[in-house]
Amino acid sequence: TMDAQALQRRKFLNMGVSGVAAFAIGGLLKYQQALAAVPAGAPFFSLNNIGDLLPPDENGIMLPPGFRSRVVARSGEPPIGSPGYTWHSAPDGGACFATDDGGWIYVSNSEIRSNGGGVGALRFAANGDLVDAYSILKNTSINCAGGATPWQTWLSCEEFTVGQVYECDPFGVKPAIVRPALGSFRHEAVAVDTLNDCLYLTEDAPDG
């Protein structure tokens, strides 16, 4: 029943912290080590004073002065002209990850049903050129939102009754890993709390 399912979720959240800790501790330790290596006074940019929004540009997007938009991928088409990989339909949650060469990787969930979902990645050079596109998760369903971890992985969440959370490598080197300790339900998103060494997960369901 619904009450029984809710009770199981509460029991997991209240009593299953050891499983979550086992998943998170390795990444959190790596994050703390990396954070200690960040030099004091590292640049930080606020978005509070970026200016008023201008009229929509050619892509229909309103941006402040100095910003521009461009289309980098279209569903059903190869992002960089290579026939080897086609950008997915139904894009949803995503995040960006810095690369060592000054560029970045954008990852995007696909909310297709019936094992047609997954996660795609676009890699950009430091000058903004798109240099690679590839899949980092395949054969999953209704990948809605998720969350970036401080140790440079992407948690992709399935949004259906027995949905799972998959930890994905944005660089496409390591295979994605399902994380059963994060529960089986209609997942929405994940947030990593590095101060308290825990994860917060939201559920996309009428009863929350």
What are these regions (language model features)?
Residues T1-K11:
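N-terminal secretory signal peptides
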Residues A6, G26-P65, S69:
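C-terminal segment of N-terminal export signals and the immediately downstream linker at the start
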Residues G16-V20, A24:
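Sec-dependent signal peptide hydrophobic core
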Residues D57-S75, S82-Y85, F124-L137, C168-R186:
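Blade-edge beta-strand/turn elements of extracellular beta-propeller
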Residues M62-P64, R70-S110:
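Beta-strand-rich domains and repeat architectures in extracellular enzymes and scaffolds
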Residues Y85-F97, N139-W151, S184-C198:
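Beta-rich, blade/repeat-based domains predominating
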Residues V107-A176:
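Well-ordered mid-protein domain cores that form the structural environment of catalytic cofactors
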Residues Q152-G208:
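Internal, well-ordered domain-core segments that constitute the primary functional module
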